[in-house]
């Protein structure tokens, strides 16, 4: 499977970090959150980070070109409808994850892989919220502080 578009559910520290590195790697990214203020703060943080990386010579591409690959949205259907890969980075709350995975399963293409970033909840339980448990994986990211 060729991954071109990534949907990130949750624009907090982990989610916006995943969106940033995905865009740097050249993917189209849809960053979704349920809170407009958190979403806009995430975009501001990503922009700041990209500019710093560029200033330090760690990012050769124009930060605005990278940022243009990140599409912020409150709408889960918009975020996942063209996604090849979805990464959920929301609170460690099974009800929150149930809502995300149920909705993502409804709107994501049949070939899409759905990933959870959980560190404490059973992945098999999360997979059970979908009609495609075989396409649900666990993926733990690391949020660097420097």
Residue ranges and their predicted role:
Residues 1-49, 56, 107:
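NAD(P)+-binding Rossmann beta1-loop-alpha1 motif at the extreme N-terminus of oxidoreductases
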Residues 19-21, 43-44, 98-101, 126-128:
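Short amphipathic alpha-helical segments
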């Amino acid at each position: 499977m060729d991954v071109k578009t990534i949907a990130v559910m949750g624009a907090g520290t982990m989610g916006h970090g995943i969106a940033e590195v995905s865009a740097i790697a050249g993917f189209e990214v849809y960053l979704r959150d349920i809170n407009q203020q958190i979403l806009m703060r995430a975009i501001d943080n990503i922009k700041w980070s990209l500019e710093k990386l560029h200033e330090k010579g760690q990012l050769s591409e124009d930060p605005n070109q990278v940022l243009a690959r990140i599409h912020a949205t409150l709408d889960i259907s918009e975020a996942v409808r063209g996604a090849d890969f979805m990464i959920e980075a929301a609170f460690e709350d099974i009800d929150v994850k149930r809502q995300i995975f149920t909705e993502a399963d409804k709107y994501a293409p049949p070939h899409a892989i759905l990933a959870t970033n959980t560190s404490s909840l059973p992945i098999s339980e999360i997979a059970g919220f979908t009609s495609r448990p075989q396409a649900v994986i666990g993926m733990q990211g690391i949020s660097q502080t420097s």
